[in-house]
Design a protein with these regions (language model features):
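Active-site-proximal alpha-helix that buttresses catalytic centers in soluble enzyme cores
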Residues: 19-209
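Single conserved hydrophobic/aromatic residue that forms the stacking wall/gate
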Residues: 1-14
Length: 209
């Protein structure tokens, strides 16, 4: 007589959304890192990362065949050695630097800021749940990559949207566009490079992408 329970739930959500004052927050998303500095954690990270179709864009069967037979049995040891050169006492340098960005952004703006990694922890799902529990319904998602690419911004956007549909369907997502041409970003990078070069004696500066 009065419609299905599912329809009723939809109407309730719409009414709540209209009545709810918009609360804004920022979600910073970076690539990710192994959970620990050991071979098992590195292997798990590589497995998740290289299983992403936006990173390795080949037929799934071939992707997994190469990954399971030729990469995961050998690559974790080499990758672990590379991580050992940069790992800190506080943990992953990527997660630490992302936390630093979060804290500086909070200090400068007073905004509520969550961080997440596209692969491994802290997860996007956890961040979205935290935002939901704290009543933030308008979210500015900032993929921390200046450029646009399938393996960075695109996969991040797809995953955030997928998880938001599952755990936070009422969220309004606003994705910040790639900022590689932003004048302030370019000046900040240039300033950092110049200051570093003044402190260190190098013969050449090489840019690699």
């Amino acid at each position: 007589r009065y419609g299905s329970s599912a329809a009723s739930d939809v109407y309730k959500r719409q009414i709540i959304k209209l009545l709810m004052k918009s609360k804004e927050a920022v979600l910073l998303v970076n690539l990710g890192s192994p959970k620990k500095l050991d071979k098992k954690s590195v292997r798990e990270y590589l497995d998740v990362f290289l299983s992403d179709d936006y990173v390795v864009d080949i037929p799934k069967f071939l992707q997994q065949l190469i990954l399971k037979l030729f990469i995961l049995p050998f690559r974790p040891k080499q990758t672990l050695h590379a991580y050992e050169q940069i790992w800190t006492n506080a943990g992953s340098p990527l997660i630490i630097s992302t936390l630093n960005i979060k804290n500086k952004l909070i200090k400068k703006t007073g905004w509520h800021v969550e961080i997440a990694m596209r692969y491994e922890d802290p997860s996007i799902e956890l961040a979205l749940n935290n935002l939901k529990l704290n009543g933030f319904n308008k979210i500015y998602v900032v993929p921390l990559y200046p450029h646009n690419a399938m393996a960075t911004t695109i996969t991040t956007k797809v995953e955030v949207e997928r998880l938001a549909n599952e755990v936070f369907p009422d969220a309004e997502l606003n994705f910040i566009k790639p900022f590689y041409k932003n004048e302030k970003y370019i000046k900040a990078i240039s300033k950092g490079v110049r200051e570093y070069l003044l402190e260190h004696n190098f013969d050449k500066l090489i840019f690699s992408y």
